A protein has these predicted regions:
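Glycine-rich active-site loops that engage anionic ligands at enzyme catalytic sites
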Residues: 1-221
């Protein structure tokens, strides 16, 4: 259940599930997110989950209904019908794409081959999709050391680049700027143009499969 909520505009409420960013907190967010999607209330225009918050955008004519619904949500601890998919995503960790592997080695006190085994054996939770269409925030790596963002973000990062900051990973769906430490590249399509929806969804899981540079180039062709 969420801890607090507040009205953030005439047509939106923000539910706050606490400060911690972890699987259990996010599971509560996703539980309510999936519940609202399943119920398909006519007065809810959009629902946006994040690590530990849930934004509900509603039709202003139904403010009383949304207030009653939020009170109801507070009593729902877990919604069991959470459909999730585990995605196996091929990634090439070759140094040509892992431009910041030295940062990873220094921050986590392990050589990059060891990190590759560590990263590719982790089952990541899709915490949220945001900032650009299809961009997934994945966690959590079992590390207790800090790997900060780059001091000088890159102006241009190729689509498919995989980045790491602390215990989180992202996959850049499009060419863009960014400050995450790049560790590899994938040809996985993060956005379905036919359905106009992201391929990954909050609550899904991801496991990376390490492939050679030759295999990666063949996959791109």
């Amino acid at each position: 259940m969420f801890i607090t909520y507040q009205q953030t505009s005439e047509q939106s409420y923000l539910l706050d599930y606490g400060e911690d960013i972890n699987f259990n907190t996010n599971k509560k967010v996703i539980s309510h997110f999936k519940y609202l999607l399943k119920k398909n209330y006519k007065y809810i225009l959009n629902v946006v989950p994040s690590f530990n918050k849930l934004l509900i955008v509603f039709d202003i004519e139904f403010k009383k209904d949304i207030e009653n619904l939020i009170k109801k949500l507070k009593s729902i601890k877990d919604y069991d019908e959470i459909d999730s998919i585990q995605h196996l995503i091929s990634i090439c960790y070759d140094e040509e794409y892992a431009l910041d592997y030295k940062n990873v080695e220094n921050a986590f006190s392990m050589d990059f081959d060891e990190f590759i085994n560590f990263h590719s054996s982790t089952i990541f939770n899709v915490f949220m999709i945001g900032f650009m269409p299809g961009l997934p925030f994945l966690g959590l790596l079992s590390v207790n050391k800090s790997l900060p963002r780059l001091e000088n973000p890159r102006i241009s990062i190729p689509a498919g680049s995989v980045g790491v900051v602390d215990n989180l990973s992202v996959i850049y769906p499009n060419q863009s700027s960014g400050g995450w430490n790049l560790i590899g590249k994938t040809s996985f399509n993060l956005f379905n143009k036919n359905t106009n929806k992201p391929t990954l969804n909050p609550g899904d899981s991801v496991k990376f499969k390490s492939i050679s540079k030759k295999e990666f180039i063949e996959n791109e062709e």
